[in-house]
């Protein structure tokens, strides 16, 4: 590492520590030429691949802006949005890939947002999942109700989910998509 003071091409690492809850490494360095010390931060880059094929750095701020629109008029604090964005980044980074699809970021938002506020979840899901009809909303609401009643994850559109019935038997709930998308298939 080049010394920022004397431009000597080499430096020695004196100390290394985790920073930003393990997302980065803080290194204290010493220059053998001038003897001055300086700090560097190392962080693995995470890039998001958009539908157009272009890539850009992952941004918690963009996650917050997108989710804030869904939360307008809802009792959701800025701190809650910051924590949600942090959880989304942790989820996306846990994939181990340096580049993730924008769709994966959207999917990572859905779970924490559902826990935070169901109305905001429906608003976000309606845009992210491209709801086209009232039936899409009804299916999403039915999935949320099923989750509340059964305490489990809501079904994914078009994917059957087995829920225990009161009689001990099981019922299969399949969210139905109506309109032009229904003919296209999953």
Swiss-Prot record:
ZnF locations on chain (unnamed): 3-34
Residues annotated as signal peptide: none
Name recorded for this polypeptide: Transcriptional repressor NrdR
UniProt similarity note: Belongs to the NrdR family.
PANTHER family from the UniProt entry: TRANSCRIPTIONAL REPRESSOR NRDR (PTHR30455:SF2)
Cofactor(s) the protein needs: Zn(2+)
Physiological role: Negatively regulates transcription of bacterial ribonucleotide reductase nrd genes and operons by binding to NrdR-boxes.
GO molecular function: ATP binding; DNA binding; zinc ion binding
ATP-binding as UniProt keyword: yes
Entry superkingdom: Bacteria
Region (Disordered): 149-169
Cofactor note: Binds 1 zinc ion.
Domain ATP-cone: 46-136
GO terms, biological process: negative regulation of DNA-templated transcription
NCBIfam families associated with the record: transcriptional regulator NrdR (TIGR00244)
Record has Nucleotide-binding as a keyword: yes
Keywords: ATP-binding, DNA-binding, Metal-binding, Nucleotide-binding, Repressor, Transcription, Transcription regulation, Zinc, Zinc-finger
Organism name: Parafrankia sp. (strain EAN1pec)
